[in-house]
């Protein structure tokens, strides 16, 4: 389906959400994920660079990674995660309409058939199933976090989930997300991530970049943001079985200590 920019994207009937709405698949993938993760710069100093693509969908983020790094002199591992390859299979069969997938159609088709494909210096792997249950992939240097929204897929945004994810990060790592939600940012911070503002995309004037180390952030959240958290009526972290509401005194104290550390 066409989005506001005129680009063609896919829409999930099951989840009721459009992939990369407003600006289209490649503009969002390049700017939000590949650019903010500084993959080209980091691939020059880390080998192999390990990238987790969480929410493969129709592979726009994966294509943006290959576009940027396939000719890189150093090795890269791209690990894509999703419940199903159905969106990518559909995209391969409709590559001409989507446009961005045409140069990568053969690679995508091989991934669908075999679960792995090499594209230049990029080794691309697919991991099916529930990402929350654990994955057999090496710890990443960058996570392109693109599941369905907290409203449609709440289990992928909980504090407990992000705590488990953070515990697996043994290398300096960034996580990029389209969300600008105060509750999501609070959740990431309480899970252990340092959290910062990301660049605009589409109708959003900010996105989110989280990291294991504060020096990986360009614009870390600060005391002014904490003031907004304090005043918000929906800043409580997204816990399993929890409800939206203001942040508790205990959570705010922990958040303040982490942000101001």
Regions found by a protein language model. Give the residues of each.
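The AdoMet/dcAdoMet-binding core of the Class I SAM-like
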Residues: 39-139, 159, 191, 201-202, ...
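S-adenosyl-L-methionine
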Residues: 1-52, 156, 160
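SAM/dcSAM-binding transferase cores
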Residues: 1, 96, 119-120, 206-261
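A short glycine-rich, Lys/Arg-flanked "PGG" loop and its adjoining helix->strand segment in the class I
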Residues: 155-172
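Conserved beta-strand signature within the Rossmann-like core of class I S-adenosyl-L-methionine
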Residues: 142-144, 171-179
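A short SAM/SAH-binding and catalytic strip from SAM-dependent methyltransferases
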Residues: 141-156
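Conserved Class I S-adenosyl-L-methionine
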Residues: 185-211
């Amino acid at each position: 389906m066409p989005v506001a920019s005129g680009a063609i994207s896919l829409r999930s009937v099951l989840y009721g959400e459009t992939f990369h709405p407003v600006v289209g698949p490649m503009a969002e993938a390049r700017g939000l994920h590949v650019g903010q993760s500084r993959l080209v710069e980091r691939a020059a100093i880390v080998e192999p660079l390990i990238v987790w693509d969480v929410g493969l969908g129709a592979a726009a983020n994966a294509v943006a990674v290959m576009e940027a790094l396939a000719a890189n002199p150093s090795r890269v591992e791209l690990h894509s995660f999703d419940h199903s390859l159905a969106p990518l299979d559909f995209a391969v069969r409709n590559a001409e309409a989507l446009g961005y997938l045409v140069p990568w159609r053969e690679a995508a088709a091989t991934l669908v058939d075999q679960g792995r494909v090499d594209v230049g210096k990029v080794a691309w792997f697919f991991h099916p199933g529930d990402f929350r249950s654990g994955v057999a992939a090496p710890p990443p240097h960058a996570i392109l976090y693109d599941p369905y929204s907290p409203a449609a897929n709440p289990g992928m945004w909980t504090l407990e989930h992000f705590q488990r994810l953070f515990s697996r990060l043994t290398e300096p790592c960034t996580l990029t997300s389209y969300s600008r939600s105060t509750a999501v940012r609070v959740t990431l911070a309480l899970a252990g991530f340092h959290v910062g503002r990301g660049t605009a995309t589409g109708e959003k004037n900010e996105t989110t970049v989280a990291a294991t180390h504060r020096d990986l952030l360009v614009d870390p959240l600060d005391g002014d943001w904490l003031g907004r958290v304090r005043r918000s009526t929906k800043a409580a972290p997204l816990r399993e079985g929890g409800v939206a509401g203001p942040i508790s005194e205990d959570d705010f104290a922990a958040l303040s200590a982490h942000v101001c550390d």
